[in-house]
Amino acid sequence: KKLNKEEWFKRIEGLYHKYNIQLKKFYHILSEVDVYSSGAKLSIQNGYYRPELKEADKSFIECKEIRHPIVEKIHTETEFITNDIELGVQNKKDGVLLFGTNACGKSTFMKSIGLNLIMAQAGLFVAAKEFIYKPYTQIFTRILNNDNIFRSQSSFAVEIQELKSILKRADNNSLVLGDELCSG
């Protein structure tokens, strides 16, 4: 017997309802396989490094030759400058005040740290030569310069309010990334 369109939809709907739980489990497993196989392919193609987890009293990052995984692919006409960073490592600095002339890579470096940390904590390889860390429980960013015209707040007032909120919630296991603070 040849089925018409409506009968096909009813059969498919019936199968979906019958195997709904199994299908959801299958889709979940398939999505994880997709994420990790894509991550593995990118890692091989781009020379990414397997991050190392290390036990410590508080969160930290110690990395060599960190790169921005997106910028290095977009700007292929120039050599990407790598950087080293240690944050929260025992007897070392818990923070860095990064300054320099315009367009020298400060924002890219800061975003490189955040992106690579998120990649590491998601179980992916990272754009660095070495990456040792204890996971952070919170990552706060203050990157965009925004005013709030609905509340009649200047960019500076919004920045101060956001910084206050970040500082209230941050602890030893938080990473705070801020770009061009108090420039409004």
Task: Enumerate the predicted regions with their spans.
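Alpha-helical coupling/stalk and coiled-coil linker elements that connect catalytic or binding modules
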Residues: 1-104, 108-139, 162
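Switch/coupling sub-region of P-loop NTPases
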Residues: 138-184
